[in-house]
């Protein structure tokens, strides 16, 4: 479901005893996650580690069909080609998501007046073959969202309905299980690129507008 207000609990800094217990529990868990040695996102080590585990982003294939199960088996059995993830194909959905993920994160931080911390690929504390790479976790102790995870999808063409696709819902469940946290916000954004300055100026839509610079290694 889509909710206009994502705050589902009271301020964790409330003097209420139970809320303080919850705050301490979340704070302790975040310290545990921060202490885990993790490869940097999208580094060679990060891709290698992800390939050696079932991650939150692909584990949904187990539940879809026999075909998708075989797809997952093939992905894990074939040799890993890291270069395919580093190709500067600016038209691919993968590149689109990587390009606009920081912008989506800043938007989330802006509307919620908080800060999101990035994590790498986190292994499950008990089942080492399961891992998750959250797009971020709110680690600001003064925020009402303290301890909440964030999953971002940057839509290329499809319409945003406010209802997460099943594979995204499964992905968030696995992320919360791996990180031992109880909440995850799902943020879908859709960006429109203007081909020239004139189109940008003449656009009369009421959507948020702005410009940013992106540097690509050739």
Where in this protein do the model-derived segments appear?
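Homeobox/homeodomain signature
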Residues: 63, 90, 106, 112-113, ...
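Charged, glycine-rich intrinsically disordered N-terminal tails and low-complexity linkers that flank
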Residues: 1-99, 193-195, 200, 206-218
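Acidic-basic catalytic patches of nuclease active cores, encompassing PD-(D/E)XK
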Residues: 94-116
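Nucleic-acid nuclease catalytic cores
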Residues: 110-134, 138-218
């Amino acid at each position: 479901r889509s909710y206009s207000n994502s705050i589902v609990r009271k301020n964790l800094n409330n003097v209420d005893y139970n809320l303080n217990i919850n705050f301490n529990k979340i704070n302790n868990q975040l310290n545990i996650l921060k202490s885990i040695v993790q490869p940097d996102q999208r580094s060679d080590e990060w891709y290698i580690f992800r390939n050696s585990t079932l991650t939150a982003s692909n584990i949904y294939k187990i539940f879809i069909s026999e075909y998708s199960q075989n797809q997952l088996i093939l992905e894990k059995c074939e040799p890993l080609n890291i270069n395919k993830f580093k190709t500067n194909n600016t038209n691919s959905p993968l590149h689109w998501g990587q390009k606009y993920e920081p912008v989506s994160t800043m938007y989330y931080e802006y509307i919620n007046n908080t800060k999101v911390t990035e994590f790498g690929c986190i292994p499950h504390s008990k089942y080492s073959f399961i891992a998750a790479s959250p797009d971020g976790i709110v680690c600001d102790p003064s925020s009402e969202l303290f301890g909440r995870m964030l999953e971002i999808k940057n839509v290329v063409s499809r319409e945003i309905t406010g209802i997460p696709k099943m594979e995204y819902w499964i992905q968030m469940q696995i992320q919360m299980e791996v990180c031992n946290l109880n909440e995850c916000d799902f943020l879908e954004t859709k960006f429109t690129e203007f081909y020239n300055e004139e189109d940008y100026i003449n656009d009369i839509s009421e959507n948020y507008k702005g410009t940013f610079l992106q540097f690509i290694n050739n």
